[in-house]
Regions:
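Short functional hotspots at interaction and active-site rims
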Residues: 1-168
Length: 168
């Protein structure tokens, strides 16, 4: 299981489009003020688990609370949880929380998004968010927290395979 955070904002919109030759493409693009959202979830071969969005930056305390309330119930005995090197992940309490289910923690090498299949899932998620172009914080949070249905099992297996992991 891979765990990571990403950001989303109320100003996300498509930057490119198509139109018939000779016709100008016009669409509204937000400028000025926007609100940023932090999104965290886990990725398994079977799909996305424990999606949660926060309207502020991730802290160690928030990450620990998310682990206990949202991720821990989805973990199976002996799972390996792979984290990146965000400072919030390095808290000693993280290993304690995961040890309650006999799970071990592995950290990715620094600056190695190519080894993290959840980055590919986040790429698809952000394209989906740009398509929807949600402008309100509650609407964006609702979309993010219901995103688990967006990812099929075969697609998640492909994310893992693209990063060089065996999916059998």
């Amino acid at each position: 299981m891979f765990v990571d955070e990403t950001g989303a904002a109320t100003n996300m919109a498509r930057r490119h489009g198509r139109r018939l030759r000779g016709h100008r493409l016009r669409c509204g693009v937000p400028h000025g003020h926007y609100k940023a959202i932090t999104f965290v979830c886990g990725l398994r071969l079977r799909g996305v688990v424990a999606p949660k969005a926060y309207d502020r930056a991730m802290t160690a305390a928030m990450f620990e609370a998310w682990l206990e309330r949202h991720l821990l119930p989805t973990l199976e005995e002996g799972d390996i949880v792979v984290l990146d090197n965000l400072q919030a992940h390095k808290s000693p309490r993280v290993a304690e929380i995961l040890a309650t289910k006999n799970c071990t923690v592995q950290y990715l090498p620094p600056y190695s998004p190519d080894f993290n299949p959840i980055e590919k899932a986040y790429s698809k998620l952000k394209a989906f968010l740009r398509k929807l172009a949600e402008r309100t914080v509650p609407g964006l949070i609702a979309i993010l927290e219901s995103c688990a249905d967006l990812f099929r099992q075969t697609e998640c297996e492909n994310f893992f395979a693209a990063c060089g992991y065996d999916t059998t």
